[in-house]
Amino acid sequence: MKELLKLGVYTLLGTLLLSAPFAGLGMLSTHLVTEKTFWIQLIALFLSAVSLQGLWLNPSKGLCPWTYVDILPLSLLGLILLSYPYSIHPEPEKLLFIGQMVVLWYLLRQVFHEYPVLIGYFSMFFIATGLIEAIWGFRQLQGWAYSNHSLFRLTGSFFNPGPYSGYLAITLPVALGILLEQSKRNMPYYLSMGCIGTAIVVLPAGMSRSAWIAVVVSCAWVYALYRLDRKQAATRLRQHKRWYIIGGILGGILLLGGSASLYTLKK
């Protein structure tokens, strides 16, 4: 009974955490930024309290095993701390928030270690939020809904197109991964297809070059993980080495040209 109750609490807190893009408490002036940040911090605080209490009362499950991926958040935090301009100290609150997000990463890793069943649920809920955001943005582009910025037509539930495009960019590879996992057409398949289709339609209108690059790189990586046979690829590379070299050179030229075009896009 205690385990079921704890699972329910984790499910509720995770659902509230993933609902952060739509959070609005109606009490803070800069509600589109501050309220979302405060919402994440509040839910993360409750999540850490529940997780620490669970480890204290039931230490048998232990801490989650570390992988090479777990080094990345700490590495990113270290890089940010080293490159931060302490002389002018422009945004100390962002340093605090980034540190909190690193702690949240390890909290979620511990939650998934204790209850792996939540991975599927949280993934599907995350994709659903991406689908809602994409539909929201499409309605704004068509003039059926107001944006949150007078200078931009497309913002979703965010303040400007930058974070909105970034949010869509992180939902796309997750949706693609779940889509490639499905052996039959079921609810996760159609939900992932809907998220990918609507996000691809809306994302170019955000004019976010970093989001476009992130989508291409991350989706290519996800596709390679699920569909690329390394041994077969190595065999083909040895058999058609010349053509792969030519293709690599042409691809590099196209990449440089595309990068230059993206750089000058907003000038």
Label the model's feature ranges.
Residues 1-4:
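Short, Lys/Arg-rich, polar N-terminal cytosolic tail immediately upstream
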Residues 6-23, 41-54, 74-107, 117-266:
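Alpha-helical transmembrane segments of multi-pass inner-membrane proteins
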Residues 23-37, 56-62, 88:
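Short, hydrophobic transmembrane alpha-helix segments
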Residues 59-64, 252-255:
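Membrane-interface interhelical linkers
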Residues 69-72:
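Polytopic alpha-helical membrane-helix bundles and their juxtamembrane interface segments
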Residues 114:
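Active-site pocket-lining segment
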